[in-house]
């Protein structure tokens, strides 16, 4: 049986895969497992419960709150807020547990349940496994005054926005800037506008009217086309696109060009380096980050620590080594001085502040990194477990890397969930990248066929 918890909590189609019954059972099991693990001490435990605007979040929130309270946990409902806001507030309010209901950038019918432990950090795999294994057990239920209470905490949004604003250390940092924000009809529809406006920016918000059904619908960081057009139309200095739960951010310069996560990391790395706040002069990226990022950072004596794909692996490296900046090309950017997870609004604020403080355009700042042409082919129906040991494949990869030299690279990455091997090639020209990628994909297909 497949593991219920994925790399980012439990996800599925709401009311089909992710039912109210499952949400309640998960919450009861989480309360008891964490209690047995000593997470609560000897006092009445507390949990923070948040959600994005999806319609299904309403019944899932009710189920989670009921499960926790029935297990003796006092619940703080904070309503619709971004995932990074939930993580921050778990730490700020010193709750023992946090629960975020969101499927991030996924389509509206999906939803998810993500747990945070004390401090606003993701639960370790062993605790997730324990929760999953012990769902449905006949737990002893508290009665009387030991039953948990549920209360709404409306000031949570203001608390989080204050944190965002204070992270810039100065007031009116963005005064004089015109910025377009695409909040994906998601959880940042109120927090993003409030934070940027408070810091002095003129904000033009689009896709900021969530109705429970329109989250991520042809908008946000996965569909930035309307943002690009709007930035040019209104003559804005820049634009920012978030996803449904605002844990990622992509930017658009004044000419409508996309500035992806790799470029954002490069820009912020130089800003932190100037302020002597780039820990160990290192940034963390994944093996799929563009080689141009590594080349750009090397030119400024900044080391790039590369991890497996996934923001959880970026965060693991940052936590283990005390690094202050990391992220992915997709726009998940983690600034550990201010957050325990990727925070799109925080990232966007600091990117805009860099534009304001340097007096340069975002396009000029992004030129610190030249993106190498990239080709990617997903080879399906192959034995992915042999990808790193097949002699024909290994020889083809070695030959390609020798041909590319320092001007490119090859990455073969087996999928974690499908019989697929992803072949990625970066080279000096798009034509060369496409050709080498196609040849390698054919070798993988022939050599690893099932």
From Swiss-Prot:
Protein name: Phosphoglucosamine mutase
Metal-binding keyword on record: yes
Description of post-translational modifications: Activated by phosphorylation.
Active-site residues per Swiss-Prot or TrEMBL entry: 104 (phosphoserine intermediate)
Cellular component, GO annotation: cytosol
Signal peptide span: none
GO molecular function, one term: phosphomannomutase activity
Modified residues (Phosphoserine): 104
Domain of life per record: Bacteria
Gene3D superfamilies reported in the protein's UniProt record: Alpha-D-Glucose-1,6-Bisphosphate, subunit A, domain 3, Alpha-D-phosphohexomutase, C-terminal domain
EC number: 5.4.2.10
Family designation: Belongs to the phosphohexose mutase family.
Keyword Protease: no
HAMAP family: GlmM_B (MF_01554_B)
Matching PANTHER family: PHOSPHOGLUCOMUTASE (ALPHA-D-GLUCOSE-1,6-BISPHOSPHATE-DEPENDENT), PHOSPHOHEXOSE MUTASE
A Gene Ontology biological process term: carbohydrate metabolic process
Gene name per UniProt: glmM
Residues at which Mg(2+) binds: 104, 243, 245, 247
Cofactor needs: Mg(2+)
InterPro entries named among the record's database cross-references: A-D-PHexomutase_a/b/a-I (IPR005844), A-D-PHexomutase_a/b/a-I/II/III (IPR016055), A-D-PHexomutase_a/b/a-II (IPR005845), A-D-PHexomutase_a/b/a-III (IPR005846), A-D-PHexomutase_C (IPR005843), A-D-PHexomutase_C_sf (IPR036900), A-D-PHexomutase_CS (IPR016066), Alpha-D-phosphohexomutase_SF (IPR005841)
Keywords: Isomerase, Magnesium, Metal-binding, Phosphoprotein
Substrates-to-products reaction catalysed: alpha-D-glucosamine 1-phosphate = D-glucosamine 6-phosphate
């Amino acid at each position: 049986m497949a593991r219920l918890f994925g790399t980012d909590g439990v996800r599925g189609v709401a009311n089909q895969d992710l039912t109210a019954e499952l949400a309640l059972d998960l919450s009861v099991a989480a309360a008891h497992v964490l209690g047995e693990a000593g997470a609560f001490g000897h006092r009445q435990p507390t949990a923070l419960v948040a959600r994005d605007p999806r319609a299904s979040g309403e019944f899932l929130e009710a189920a989670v709150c009921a499960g926790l309270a029935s297990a003796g946990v006092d619940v703080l409902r904070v309503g619709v807020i971004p995932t990074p806001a939930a993580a921050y507030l778990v730490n700020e309010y010193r709750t023992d547990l946090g629960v975020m209901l969101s499927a991030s950038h996924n389509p509206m019918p999906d939803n998810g349940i993500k747990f945070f432990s004390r401090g606003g950090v993701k639960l370790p795999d062993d605790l997730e496994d324990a929760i999953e294994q012990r769902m449905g057990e006949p737990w002893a239920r508290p009665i009387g005054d030991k039953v948990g209470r549920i209360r709404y905490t409306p000031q949570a949004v203001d608390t989080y926005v204050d944190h965002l604003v204070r992270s810039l250390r100065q007031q009116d940092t963005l005064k004089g800037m015109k910025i377009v924000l695409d909040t994906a009809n998601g959880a940042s529809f109120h927090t993003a506008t409030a934070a940027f406006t408070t810091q002095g920016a003129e904000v033009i918000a689009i896709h900021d009217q969530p109705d429970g059904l329109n989250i991520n619908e042809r908008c946000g960081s996965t569909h930035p086309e309307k943002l690009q057009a709007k930035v040019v139309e209104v003559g804005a200095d820049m634009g920012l696109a978030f996803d449904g739960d605002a844990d990622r951010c992509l930017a658009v310069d004044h000419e409508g060009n996309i500035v992806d996560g790799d470029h954002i990391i490069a820009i912020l790395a130089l800003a932190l380096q100037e302020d002597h706040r780039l820990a160990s002069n290192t940034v963390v990226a994944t093996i799929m980050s563009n080689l141009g990022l590594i080349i750009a950072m090397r030119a400024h004596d900044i080391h790039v620590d590369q991890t497996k794909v996934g923001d959880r692996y970026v965060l693991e490296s940052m936590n283990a080594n005390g690094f202050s900046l990391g992220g992915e090309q997709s726009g998940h950017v983690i600034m550990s001085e201010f957050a325990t997870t990727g925070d799109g609004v925080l990232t966007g604020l600091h990117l805009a502040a860099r534009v304001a403080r340097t007096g340069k355009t975002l396009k000029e700042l992004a030129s610190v990194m030249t993106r190498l042409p990239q080709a990617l082919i997903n080879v399906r129906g192959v034995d992915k477990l042999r990808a790193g040991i097949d002699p024909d494949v290994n020889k083809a990869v070695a030959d390609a890397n020798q041909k590319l030299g320092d001007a490119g690279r090859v990455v073969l990455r087996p999928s974690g969930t499908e019989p697929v091997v992803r072949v990625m090639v970066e080279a000096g020209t798009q034509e060369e990248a496409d050709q080498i990628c196609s040849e390698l994909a054919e070798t993988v297909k022939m050599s690893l066929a099932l």
